[in-house]
């Protein structure tokens, strides 16, 4: 969404200092606790081999299929390519409409990105949908027509903690419904995508 906001001239290059400052502030406790800068910068690359499953209780694309016996690396690469492609399409559509989107449109696009990225990426935990949950609540508060999207996204995320109540594939279908509904609202109201 930052790229779209820069294309719309709503952010300046100097605003990047806010992002950099936030990164430094979030790293400060670990630095004070004795972690090296190298360890902090390589934390995600160091974890790449730790998780080999396709989903870790996330209501995602991979929760819709039986992953037993699948080549997790091939499917994982497919999921990464799919997530990258969807993200590139959403960002390019937002850049194309820059300057002509409403605040609700920016909020919808901001919601679509974490919904789509986390839904299609492999090896996701349910907690990675928190940003989508928060943005769906913000969108519903701003635009009452988005209340069903909020209900679906939050229900799918919250239900992952009660696997005995709703199965993970059901939660994934609900999250997919939230993604599609947000996409349809964005396309209809903002002529994006």
Give the ranges of each region predicted by the language model.
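Transmembrane helices and adjacent periplasmic/lumenal helix-loop junctions
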Residues: 1-6, 25, 116-129, 155-163
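Transmembrane-lumen/periplasm boundary regions of multi-pass, lipid-linked membrane glycan transferases
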Residues: 20-55, 59-68
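Structural signal for the C-terminal ends of transmembrane alpha-helices
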Residues: 2-10, 33, 91-100, 139-144, ...
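Alpha-helical transmembrane segments of integral membrane proteins
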Residues: 10-18, 22, 106-113, 129, ...
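Aromatic/glycine/proline-enriched transmembrane-helix motif characteristic
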Residues: 47-120, 184-186, 190
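Alpha-helical transmembrane segments of multi-pass membrane proteins
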Residues: 19, 134-138, 173-177
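Perimembrane helix-loop-helix junctions
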Residues: 1-21, 31-35, 131
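Transmembrane helical bundles and short interhelical boundary loops of multi-pass, membrane-embedded
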Residues: 43-62, 92, 110, 143-193
């Amino acid at each position: 969404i930052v790229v779209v906001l820069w294309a719309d001239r709503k952010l300046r290059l100097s605003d990047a200092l806010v992002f950099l400052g936030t990164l430094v502030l979030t790293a400060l406790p670990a630095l004070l606790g004795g972690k090296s800068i190298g360890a902090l910068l390589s934390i995600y690359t160091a974890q790449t081999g730790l998780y080999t499953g396709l989903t870790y209780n996330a209501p995602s694309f991979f929760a819709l299929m039986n992953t037993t016996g699948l080549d997790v690396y091939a499917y994982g690469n497919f999921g990464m390519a799919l997530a990258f492609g969807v993200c590139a399409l959403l960002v390019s559509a937002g850049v194309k409409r820059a300057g002509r989107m409403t605040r609700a449109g920016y909020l919808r696009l901001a919601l679509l990105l974490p919904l789509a990225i986390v839904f299609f990426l492999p090896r996701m935990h349910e907690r990675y949908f928190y940003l989508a949950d928060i943005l769906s609540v913000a969108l519903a508060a701003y635009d009452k027509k988005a209340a069903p999207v909020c209900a679906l996204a939050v229900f799918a995320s919250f239900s992952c903690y009660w696997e005995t109540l709703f199965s993970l594939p059901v939660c994934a279908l609900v999250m997919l419904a939230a993604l599609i509904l947000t996409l349809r609202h964005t396309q209809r109201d903002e002529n994006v995508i």
